[in-house]
Amino acid sequence: MNPDRSLIQKLSGLEGYLSSKIRGQGHVIPRVCSVLERGELGLQPPDKPLGSFLFLGPTGVGKTELTLECSRYLFGEGAIHRFDMSEFQHLDSVKLFLGDESGMPGRLGKVLESHTRGILLFDEVEKAHRLIWDLFLQMLDAARITLADHRTHDLSGFYVVCTSNIGSQQLMRPTRLPFATLERAVLAELHRHFRPELIGRFDEKVVFKPLSPDTQREIAMIVIGEKVERYRKMGIELEVEEEPLELLIRTGITKALGARPMKRTVQKYLGDVVRERMKLRNLF
């Protein structure tokens, strides 16, 4: 097999791209890139998905954001298919996900019917009903799955990503223990929650670190920079000084939600500034 030169060049830039977008998780990115590169080069087993990941860690540390950036880099926009598994906790909600025997497709089946390639993202997988966990055993072990509506689907063009907050309290409590020790504690808790045969089928199981103050600042700078650049392209020049920057960091990153509120905070703050400036310039 001789892979296309342009594909090799593209994959050569993958790790650098992800590192520029995701901060504070340098131990995660090389492991993720290894699986993605094998998948894109056709080196994964042909009877399995392109690759599979279990991302563990607190809310707002980059698990979902990393998945989004992987999808954006490899496939462009619109190739990530996200499922909030907390919506499928109860037995009567399982058919909404898997379909039912009458032939009515569920949400997963509808995605697989209309797409053949991309990333399937299952957020907070630990909250799903146990019947759905059984599906993951099948999904990770074979490139073809049959859902409750009796339809069979091909997953050989997809990456599967599951995120979980299992063990997050181990990472969030004040401690001087090294991260490797905390990581082992998280994985031990994972094994108390899921069956070993399910855990063992993921290509990579990675634990994300809580965000340090320096990392929080870096994330804020990235989000602000992206927004400022967008406004610049609209002909609006902005410069964020130190005092409002610190305010954005304090309000955009919380202990409970990590950096998840940052984009919304920056959008509101800078959007209000731009709105007032546009009004003063009589632009609307």
Roles of regions detected by a PLM:
Residues 1-284:
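AAA+ P-loop NTPase nucleotide-binding core of proteostasis motors
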